[in-house]
A protein has these predicted regions:
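Short, basic-rich loop-to-helix N-cap that marks the start of a DNA-contacting helix
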Residues: 50-65
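A short, Lys/Arg-rich alpha-helix, primarily the initiator
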Residues: 2-24
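Alpha-helical residues within the helix-turn-helix
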Residues: 23, 34, 65
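Short C-terminal boundary/hinge segments that cap the last helix of small helical domains
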Residues: 68-76
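Residues that mark the N-terminal boundary/hinge immediately upstream of a DNA-recognition element
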Residues: 17, 28, 56-59, 70
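Short alpha-helical DNA-recognition segment
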Residues: 26-46
Length: 76
């Protein structure tokens, strides 16, 4: 059986894509936080490359809906 390869930096990929798509929509992190009912500080931590902060699938889903982006687009 072929061994699967996993992206060890998946959270970094998602963080960068959240920030990219948010900016493409002309949205601030505060606006995104309000849409997904999370604190502005929490969204900033998610987007920060300096913070090793992981987030739930629920949060990931809410952000994708708020940004009108498919989940798989956020992990590419």
């Amino acid at each position: 059986m072929k061994k699967l390869k996993f992206n060890p930096n998946i959270y970094d990929t998602i963080r960068k894509n959240i920030k990219k798509y948010r900016k493409e929509k002309g949205m601030t992190s505060a606006q995104l936080a309000e849409l997904v009912d999370l604190s502005h500080d929490f969204i900033r931590q998610i987007e920060s490359e300096k913070t090793a902060y992981n987030f739930s699938v629920d949060t990931f889903y809410k952000i994708s809906v708020a940004l009108d982006v498919r989940l798989d687009d956020l992990i590419k």
